[in-house]
């Protein structure tokens, strides 16, 4: 698949995330998808590698249980000759348990196989997240 087609797949994943439609996200992933936030320290419920479609819903459940997402804005999409997609995003949420607001930048990297996401890594400010999660 071309980078342009893969970018459209990522956009569809983001739209599904905005609707809370995890099944639509899973449809766009390989059965053995390797999905994780690259976290220096695993403090958030979505941290840790999720292996396969059976584990992936826990990533999104972790985000949901933390608190409402108040901004999820992809700012740029880039694809390479291998069809990989990189995205720069603006992200904000409120931690329900602490009432703290988080505003940060995210970087997402997607690798594809046969038109589906086979590998995902997202980078985030883990120190900022850890601070927001602590009382």
Where is each model-derived feature located?
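Hydrophobic pocket/interface hotspot
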Residues: 10-13, 25-26, 33, 52, ...
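A beta-strand edge to alpha-helix "cap/lid" segment located at domain peripheries
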Residues: 1-5, 61-135
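Short, mixed-charge, low-aromatic patches
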Residues: 11-20, 43-47, 63-67, 88-90
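Short, low-complexity N-terminal intrinsically disordered segments enriched in polar/charged residues
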Residues: 1-31, 134-135
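Short amphipathic alpha-helical segments, especially helix-boundary/capping motifs
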Residues: 18-19, 32-38, 83-86, 103-106
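Short, flexible micro-motifs
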Residues: 19, 23, 51, 55, ...
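A solvent-exposed, acidic/Ser-Thr-rich amphipathic alpha-helical stretch
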Residues: 24, 30-83
């Amino acid at each position: 698949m071309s980078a342009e087609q893969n970018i459209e797949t990522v956009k569809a994943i983001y739209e599904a995330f905005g609707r809370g439609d995890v099944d639509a996200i899973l449809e766009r992933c390989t059965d053995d998808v390797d999905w994780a936030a690259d976290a220096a320290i695993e403090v958030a419920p979505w941290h840790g590698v999720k292996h396969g479609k059976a584990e992936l819903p826990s990533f999104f459940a972790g985000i949901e249980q933390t608190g409402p997402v108040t901004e999820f804005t992809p700012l740029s999409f880039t694809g390479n000759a291998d069809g990989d997609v990189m995205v720069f995003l603006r992200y904000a949420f409120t931690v329900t348990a602490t009432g703290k607001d988080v505003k940060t930048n995210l970087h997402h990297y997607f690798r594809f196989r046969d038109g589906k996401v086979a590998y995902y890594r997202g980078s985030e400010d883990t120190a900022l997240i850890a601070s927001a999660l602590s009382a």
